[in-house]
From Swiss-Prot:
Protein name as catalogued: NADH:(hydroxy)cinnamate reductase subunit CrdB
Domains as described in the record: Consists of three domains. The first domain (NADH:flavin or FMN_red, PF03358) carries a non-covalently bound FMN and is used for NADH oxidation. The second, FMN_bind domain (PF04205) contains a covalently bound FMN, that acts as an electron carrier between the two other domains. The C-terminal FAD_binding_2 domain (PF00890) contains a non-covalently bound FAD and forms a site for substrate reduction.
UniProt xrefs under Pfam families: FAD_binding_2, FMN_bind, FMN_red
Cofactor binding comment, as recorded: Binds 1 FAD per subunit.
Task performed by this protein: Component of the NADH:(hydroxy)cinnamate reductase Crd that catalyzes the reduction of the double bond in cinnamate, p-coumarate, caffeate, and ferulate under anaerobic conditions with NADH or methyl viologen as the electron donor. Is moderately active against acrylate and practically inactive against urocanate, fumarate, methacrylate and crotonate. CrdB is the catalytic subunit that binds substrates. Is likely involved in protecting V.ruber from (hydroxy)cinnamate poisoning.
Organism: Vibrio ruber (strain DSM 16370 / JCM 11486 / BCRC 17186 / CECT 7878 / LMG 23124 / VR1)
Activity control summary: Is inactivated by molecular oxygen, allowing regulation of Crd activity by medium oxygen level.
GO molecular function: cinnamate reductase activity; FMN binding
Chemical reaction(s) catalysed: 3-phenylpropanoate + NAD(+) = (E)-cinnamate + NADH + H(+); 3-(3,4-dihydroxyphenyl)propanoate + NAD(+) = (E)-caffeate + NADH + H(+); phloretate + NAD(+) = (E)-4-coumarate + NADH + H(+); dihydroferulate + NAD(+) = (E)-ferulate + NADH + H(+)
Length: 806
């Protein structure tokens, strides 16, 4: 028989290891016992994938064995945290112990010989998700372990050896009988096609699962109501894995575990309808493709770490120039945070914007900006400030008191980016955007919009948008919703140009040769080593908005960041690219500043629920039904105001404002109303009752707001940009609460995106673009500027990387 024996401690000197080594030699004629160490398995973190190489090896060894022996010491009356962590890993996405025969033993210098630890271990192994088959009784407790072995590691007491033999031989019989019970029972499906439902983000997903007598033949999922992106990969890969292995023992996809399990559960329902116990298929081995762990090696001109907008832009630029590129993406699908955006990309385009009328109050917004005392403006921005004054004076002279077109220019974009980013933290440290970087952003944003159009992005040119906190209507919004338009166009272009995208492949370290960066070492989906030799590396891995501990570590702007704070970010945004940069001496800038998105879903942190309308149509009220802030203000201003009101607030809309929401459909609205996550009523009074407000208060607030819209001026909170009144039923209330949205700081870069070290000198062959880099947005980012940033500096990174290849 073949057994695996887990050394239940990371201690380099352990009597439990010595005990297992004794058993390995003593019983070699009876069984093959292989010792497994756990010293390289990280502490359990459900937000990280189960891809640690040592963990995967333990998993496969357990699956292939006839039984498992676990030797545990006793720490503070329980098992070591390292062993507990390994068992958590082995009961989360991996389940090799399910039904597996297990023998427990332990050695301790205490006379009781780990008895309390063994009791706890039995309870853990019996828990749902672990479900091991632990041999009852016959506990082997080796007390006074420091006296139990001779200098050759042999047990020195014959009675102890005799009892160990009794326990082990009983375990051999127990394992044989237990494994006979685990032999899969014969079954037959009732052939046919069965309709079930899986729960996706967009609601219930109809599924059709077809069976022959012995096989799952096909799985079809109707994804019409889902947003394109990571979910697409789930709906293809999970069914493919199930059919390949004829098993429900399929790993969930990182970043989409909820949707993955929904698909698996949906197929399990169909299996049951077809007359078979789904537990049989859950105990089957994983598909063969999930077991491939062969190391891989590649060579290219440029390797890009991160498959969001910045990374894909860099790769596409390299491919356009006839060079080759590889993109490494840690998640199962490309997209990063870009695919989760609202869609509009900021770029001053005066010729296009002149086709739109100015809105009430917009001219006043510019006048207020230009009234800033020059003593408050940093010297490098003064010339642009004065030039903007001249531009706007000419506009004023042209129209006077008459209604004009929507004014804009790269200078206005630049000054709004500058003023929008000027902030002072809790320690009195001030920050503002580096002029040379901001100038590149605002001068070249329109080129990025046009380049994306050439790549295949189609824009809705009938409307100009202002995202939340944008301060101005200059957003170019794609026809396709959210950030999907950018990611689909770029990934298809890269594929058409024979570029390579490796998903499920987090970068772990740089490949260093003769003191220079020569590529990247990554880990594949099954834990295999991926080595990429490259002439240049572009870091485009995003920020750290999904890493609460890192946010708390660097925070100097917010008085408190709670452990349970939500985020709008992809769960891939954990700051690993920043840490990777630091490993070669990269300098950091602006790390203490984090932007919150004020209008996030209070339960999930997402942006795509409720009615997400342009800020000129925002009507924000607190839980009492009163306005409390200028709805057109910057994101951190809105967030601070919301937090002062308790965090939770509501966006009020009517039927006309609803039509300006870019994130939804009537079907989705109806589902959310039914689920109680969006409120709808025929009168404002009824709406107030639904959300727990005094009807008279909400009605008075809305009446007052409507008067401000008519006048084009808000004397209460000085909102000066309006569009629609709230007057046509039905009326809506969308619950909102701030969530982490954008980490302002990151790696230091120059205008060519070279990563700078702590002495502001370039690190050879290393470039960075997107949220992983800092210095552009300073303390607060304008809505719509992130997309302008990633596509502008992503392209620059690709160009610079090519131009500086050896």
């Amino acid at each position: 028989m073949k057994f695996t024996a887990i050394v239940g401690t990371t201690s380099p000197k352990s009597y439990n290891r010595t005990l297992l080594q004794f058993m390995q030699a003593h019983f070699k004629d009876k069984a093959d016992i292989e010792l497994l160490e756990i010293d390289q398995v990280p502490m359990f973190n459900q937000d990280q994938p189960s891809t640690n190489p040592q963990l995967l090896e333990i998993n496969q060894k357990i699956i292939a064995s006839d039984g498992v022996i676990i030797a545990t010491p006793e720490y503070n009356h329980s098992i070591p945290s390292s062993l507990k962590s390994v068992l958590e890993w082995l009961s989360y996405e991996l389940h090799p112990l399910d039904g597996k025969p297990v023998m427990i033993l332990g050695a301790s210098i205490d006379a009781q010989g780990s008895s309390r630890a063994q009791l706890h271990l039995r309870q853990i192994l019996d828990a749902p998700g672990v479900n091991a088959n632990v041999m009852p009784g016959y506990e082997f407790l080796l007390g006074n372990a420091h006296q139990a072995f001779d200098d050759k590691g042999q047990l020195n007491n014959e009675a102890t050896i005799d009892f160990l033999e009794i326990c082990f031989f009983r375990f051999m019989r127990f394992a044989k009988i237990s494994n006979q019970l685990n032999v899969e029972e014969d079954f037959s499906f009732a052939p046919g096609t069965y309709e079930v439902h899986a729960l996706g983000h967009g609601g219930a997903l109809p599924m059709q699962v077809s069976f022959s007598e012995k096989k799952i033949e096909s799985i079809h999922i109707d994804t019409a109501g889902e947003t394109e992106g990571l979910a697409d990969v789930v709906f293809v890969r999970i069914p493919d894995k199930i059919i390949e292995g004829q098993t429900l023992n399929v790993d969930a996809l990182s970043g989409a575990s909820e949707t993955s399990h929904a698909v698996i559960d949906g197929v399990a329902k169909a299996v049951k309808l077809a007359g078979v116990n789904p537990d049989i298929l859950k105990k089957r081995p994983k598909p063969a493709s999930s077991l491939n762990r062969d190391d891989e090696e590649y060579s290219c001109d440029v390797v890009v770490i991160g498959g969001g907008g910045a990374g894909l832009s860099a790769a596409a630029t390299v491919l356009q120039a006839g060079k080759n590129a590889i993109v490494l993406e840690k998640f199962p699908a490309v997209g990063g945070n870009t695919i989760r955006t609202g869609g509009p990309i900021n770029a001053a385009d005066p010729e296009w914007q002149r086709t739109f009328d100015e809105n009430p109050g917009e001219r006043h917004t510019i006048e207020a900006l230009l009234s800033t005392d020059e003593s408050e403006i940093h010297p490098e921005y003064l010339a642009d400030f004065r030039a903007l004054k001249e531009e706007f004076a000419a506009y004023q002279q042209q129209f006077g008191d008459q209604k004009g077109y929507l004014f804009d220019s790269p200078l206005l974009h630049r000054m709004q980016t500058y003023f929008g980013g000027k902030r002072t933290d809790l320690e009195g440290n001030s920050i503002y955007g580096q002029y040379d970087l901001v100038k590149i952003l605002t001068d070249h944003a329109l080129e990025s919009v046009q380049w994306l159009e050439e790549i295949g992005v189609e824009y809705d040119k009938e409307v100009v948008f202002a995202p939340v906190g944008a301060l101005w209507r200059r957003g170019h919004k794609p026809v396709k919703r959210y950030g999907t338009a950018f990611i689909l166009a770029l990934s298809r272009y890269i594929e058409s140009m024979s570029g390579t995208i490796l998903t499920d492949s987090p970068a772990k370290e740089f490949l260093i040769e003769d003191g220079e960066i020569k590529g990247v070492i990554a880990t594949g989906v099954n834990g295999q080593k991926i080595t990429i030799h490259a002439k240049a590396v572009v870091l485009a891995s995003g920020g750290f908005g999904a890493n609460t501990k890192m946010l708390q570590q660097y925070n100097t702007y917010w008085s408190h960041i709670a452990d349970d704070i939500k985020t709008t970010n992809s769960y891939a945004m954990t700051g690993d690219g920043i840490v990777l940069g630091q490993s070669v001496g990269a300098g950091l800038i602006g790390m203490g500043f984090t932007q919150m998105m004020p209008v996030a879903d209070p339960n999930t942190g997402e942006l795509f629920s409720g009615l997400q309308v342009p800020p000129e149509n925002f009507v924000i009220v607190n839980q009492q039904g009163k306005r409390f802030v200028n709805e057109f203000a910057g994101r951190d201003v809105l967030t601070k105001a919301a937090l002062a009101e308790g965090g939770l607030f509501y966006l009020i809309a009517d039927d006309e404002i609803k039509k300006t929401a870019a994130n939804t459909s009537q079907e989705k609205i109806d589902r959310q109303v039914e689920a109680g996550t969006l409120f709808r009523a025929d009168t404002l009074e009824e709406l107030a009752v639904q959300v727990g407000m005094e009807p008279d208060v909400l009605v008075e607030t809305i009446n007052k707001y409507n008067r401000y819209v008519e006048a084009g001026h808000d004397p209460e909170f000085h909102k000066d940009t309006f569009s629609l009144k709230v007057e046509k039923a039905p009326f809506y209330a969308t619950p909102r609460q701030p969530a982490v949205h954008h980490t302002m700081g990151g790696l230091k870069i120059d205008t060519a995106t070279r990563v700078l070290n702590e002495n502001n000198r370039p690190i050879k062959h290393l470039y960075a673009a997107g949220e992983v880099a800092g210095g552009i947005h300073a303390g607060n980012r304008l809505g719509g500027n992130a997309l302008a940033d990633i596509f502008t500096f992503g392209r620059i990174a690709g160009k610079t990387a090519m131009s500086e290849m050896d």
